[in-house]
């Protein structure tokens, strides 16, 4: 299935039903009073987060959504039937904006969360409401009001605890394959990953986290080069970034320089993303002798002046990946506890 993370749609809520003007007409009561009923309210439109949907592709083919109109009122003070609400499922992590005002309407992050995006029109009033001591036979009634109309922008930002960063062919897909049940395409050429992959990492029966792999970044990504820029937003919700580095690239690119390239792209994209906690994962140690790999990893860390956590692994052979997973799970738990403490203090 194609991965689509942006879509524009138009929504129109139902119009309220008209009120009606009518009068009692019964045997022996030729001139009864008003008994015109109200119309029904127009149907509203809601978006609802659904964990079973993971792309916005359906909105590429259906862009216009309209809820049901309310029915007109009837005699004998019968109210018209209300229009049925329209409920549209979207993936968890969908941000909704009004395209005309650029206002963010909502952020649907939990399964079952509903968001009203177009309010149905209010019903019209029947003539029974206009009877008074001076007007015993009112003929006025009111029409139903139109429902809201909106042009909406939907933007999907995947929900993951951990995001993988790296140049194309750094081994990110191999890493997510090694630590989770996800099976992205893995090959020895750049841009094997064309859209975000999510994997659930189970540390124990009681502990797990979600990891996201996005297409590799290249220099100029923040200006649109390569594939990664359109997916950088998917890292915005993560609590931790794992920066995967190929320590022995076949094209001879300096691993330290590749780290600097991505750091610059993160800074250009947003300060928030550049400031996220980031761990260094030095991958493909299996391509060198153990002593050579260890020495090269030390050199990379020293040249980067890296002071954060560092892990040397071979994702293909799953060497060092268990320790990485355990440390990530522990780090995420510590971050959660810290956030809880800060919220209590506030």
From Swiss-Prot:
Residues 130-140 have a biased composition (Polar residues). GO terms for cellular component: cytoplasm. It is found in: Cytoplasm. Mg(2+) binds at residues 173, 193. GTP binds at residues 166-173, 191-195, 213-216, 283-286, 314-316. It comes from the Bacteria. Residues 1-159 form the Obg domain. SUPFAM superfamilies: Obg GTP-binding protein N-terminal domain (SSF82051), P-loop containing nucleoside triphosphate hydrolases (SSF52540). Keywords: Cytoplasm, GTP-binding, Hydrolase, Magnesium, Metal-binding, Nucleotide-binding. Its EC number is 3.6.5.-. GO terms for molecular function: GTP binding; GTPase activity; magnesium ion binding. Its cofactor is Mg(2+). CDD domains: Obg. InterPro entries: G_OBG, GTP-bd, GTP-bd_Obg/CgtA, GTP1-OBG_CS, GTP1_OBG_dom, GTP1_OBG_dom_sf, OBG_GTPase, P-loop_NTPase. Residues 127-149 are annotated as: Disordered. GO terms for biological process: ribosome biogenesis. PANTHER family: DEVELOPMENTALLY REGULATED GTP-BINDING PROTEIN-RELATED, MITOCHONDRIAL RIBOSOME-ASSOCIATED GTPASE 2. Belongs to the TRAFAC class OBG-HflX-like GTPase superfamily. OBG GTPase family. Monomer. HAMAP family: GTPase_Obg. An essential GTPase which binds GTP, GDP and possibly (p)ppGpp with moderate affinity, with high nucleotide exchange rates and a fairly low GTP hydrolysis rate. Plays a role in control of the cell cycle, stress response, ribosome biogenesis and in those bacteria that undergo differentiation, in morphogenesis control. This is GTPase Obg. It comes from Hydrogenovibrio crunogenus (strain DSM 25203 / XCL-2).
């Amino acid at each position: 299935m194609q991965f689509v993370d942006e879509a524009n749609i138009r929504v129109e809520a139902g119009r309220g039903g008209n009120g009606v003007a009518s009068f009692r007409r019964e045997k022996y009561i030729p001139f009864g009073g008003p008994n015109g009923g109200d119309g029904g309210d127009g149907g509203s439109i809601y978006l609802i987060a659904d964990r079973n949907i993971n792309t916005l592709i359906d909105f590429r083919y259906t862009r216009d959504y309209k809820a049901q109109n309310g029915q007109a009122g009837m005699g004998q003070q019968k109210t018209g039937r209300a229009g049925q609400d329209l409920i549209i499922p979207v993936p968890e992590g969908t941000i909704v904006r009004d395209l005309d005002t650029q206002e963010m309407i909502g952020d649907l992050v939990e399964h079952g969360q509903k968001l009203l995006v177009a309010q149905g029109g209010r019903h019209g009033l029947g003539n029974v409401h206009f009877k008074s001591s001076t007007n015993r036979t009112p003929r006025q009634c009111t029409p139903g009001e139109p429902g809201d109309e909106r042009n909406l922008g939907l933007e999907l930002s995947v929900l993951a605890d951990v995001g993988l960063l790296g140049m194309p062919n750094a081994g990110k897909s191999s890493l997510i394959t090694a630590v989770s049940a996800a099976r992205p395409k893995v090959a020895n050429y750049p841009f094997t990953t064309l859209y975000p992959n999510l994997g659930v990492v189970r540390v124990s029966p009681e502990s797990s986290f979600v990891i996201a792999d996005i297409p590799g970044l290249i220099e100029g990504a923040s200006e649109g080069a390569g594939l990664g820029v359109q997916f950088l937003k998917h890292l915005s919700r993560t609590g931790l970034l794992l920066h995967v580095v190929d320590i022995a690239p076949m094209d001879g690119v300096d691993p330290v320089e590749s780290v600097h390239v991505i750091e610059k792209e993160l800074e250009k994209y947003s300060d928030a993303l550049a400031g996220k906690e980031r761990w260094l994962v030095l991958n493909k140690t299996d391509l060198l002798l153990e002593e050579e790999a260890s020495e090269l990893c030390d050199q990379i860390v020293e040249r980067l002046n890296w002071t954060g956590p560092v892990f040397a692994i071979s994702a293909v052979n799953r060497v060092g990946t268990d320790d990485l997973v355990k440390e990530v799970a522990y780090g995420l738990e510590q971050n959660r506890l810290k956030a809880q403490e800060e919220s209590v203090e506030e």
